[in-house]
Amino acid sequence: MAWSITNKADTSSFTKMAEIRAHLKNSAENKDKNEDIFPEDVIIPSTKPKTKRATTPRKPAATKRSTKKEEVEEEVVIEEYHQTTEKNSPSPGVGDIVESVAAVELDDSDGDDEPMVQVEAGKVNHSARSDLSDLKVATDNIVKDLKKIITRISAVSTVLEDVQAAGISRQFTSMTKAITTLSDLVTEGKSKVVRKKVKTCKK
């Protein structure tokens, strides 16, 4: 298949390769900086890290304002409750407790340090007790571990004693054999000839 270029009536189209080369050369020399794929002069803006939006505080819910009648009714209900509780229970009333606490605070303003000292002493005693209990647990664990170590050491020593005893018995038997051969040589003058069985290897 052959390629062919047809001449058109339009004069703006290129007809020769020389014209195409000249056009490409001119476009390469006169190209704009904006057409560059990787421009060097362009400043790239830095990306900003995303920040969380500040949360707007919620508006407090509108509280219902109580009227004077409701306040009076609440006071009456509270007084009735206090009266019934005072009649039914032999314990002192709330007012008596508040008054006694206030009196104690006024009278013992100088003696406030004493309860704190007692509380601190109690804390020290409690911490000392906990330290003693921790120390006891630690010593118990150490004693248990030492007992385990002692049993293992005694087991190793018995094994070594058995090995040494076996070695001694072997040495003793070899010594008795040497003594018997020596006595045979002394008495007879020569050692006895003993035939050894020769093992034959199967092919």
Curated annotation (Swiss-Prot):
The modification Phosphothreonine is found at residues 84-85. Residues 25-74, 80-99 are annotated as: Disordered. Involved in the co-transcriptional or post-transcriptional endoribonucleolytic cleavage that generates sequence-homogeneous 3' ends during late transcription. Involved in postreplicative transcription elongation on intermediate and late genes. Also involved in DNA replication and in multiple steps of virion morphogenesis. Required both for inclusion of virosoplasm into crescents as well as for maturation of immature virions (IV) into mature virions (MV). It comes from the Viruses. This is Late transcription elongation factor OPG110. Residues 25-36 have a biased composition (Basic and acidic residues). The keyword Transcription applies. Transmembrane segments: none annotated. Residues 49-67 have a biased composition (Basic residues). Its main location: virion. It comes from Vaccinia virus (strain Copenhagen). Belongs to the orthopoxvirus OPG110 family. Keywords: Elongation factor, Host cytoplasm, Phosphoprotein, Protein biosynthesis, Transcription, Transcription regulation, Virion. The keyword Phosphoprotein applies. It holds the Pfam family Pox_Ag35.
